[in-house]
Amino acid sequence: VLDYDELERLVTPGTRAVVVTHASNVTGNAVDIARVAAMAHAAGALVIVDASQSAGTAKIDMDAMGLDVVCFTGHKGLMGPQGTGGLAVAEGIDVAPWAMGGTGVHSFDALQPLEWPTRLEAGTLNGHGIAGLSAGLDFIEAQGGVEAIAAYERALAERFLAGVREIPSIALYGAFDQPVRSAIVSLNVGDIDSAEISDALMQGWGIATRPGAHCAPLMHRALGTERQGIVRFSFGYFNTDEEVDTAIDALRDLAC
């Protein structure tokens, strides 16, 4: 869990930007990004939010929260295809192009056009991916929006959490009392390697989980799980109560 007092101590007038993950892809813990933005702006710094885990399952209002830049992926909560994502930039924030050429807008110019978003979109765009991401956004709206999907996924995660908490050898990782968090439950079964548990779940019950380090070695160092890793259960809109109960029963069998 983020220590806001410690963060406030670290953010000084010399800080240029505070880069923060909205929700952890390891534990599901969420950060109060509006509070972080206020700290950053008080010191004259920008706030840049990684919303890869939260976009599509948590309401993000850049203006109301005071966010300068939000980065997101399309293949998680936004239900788009892999290889899609976006960068939302508040008005007045300048971002320099990282690649040049091939926009088809001012083809005889050596530099990128100044207008948005073309200045950051060199080369051929992923048209199929953009169409898929757009379809994902339409689907979310058709289901009642982000809040409706988040409530459903959170209910599944809470159902699962209540069941696995009764298994003595299960170790849980995360602050599950947070009012807003990602629908993730991460755990270990005794001292069994996380990859072994994940493989057993797939082979025995057809349950797909994510073991290992989750591309977050520093988080695992903080949790003390560098050797064992963690088994992550991520609950989505297409999961059911019956599938949750099957996962609980499977862990109960593996923990025996």
Predicted regions and their residues:
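Pyridoxal 5′-phosphate
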Residues: 1-256
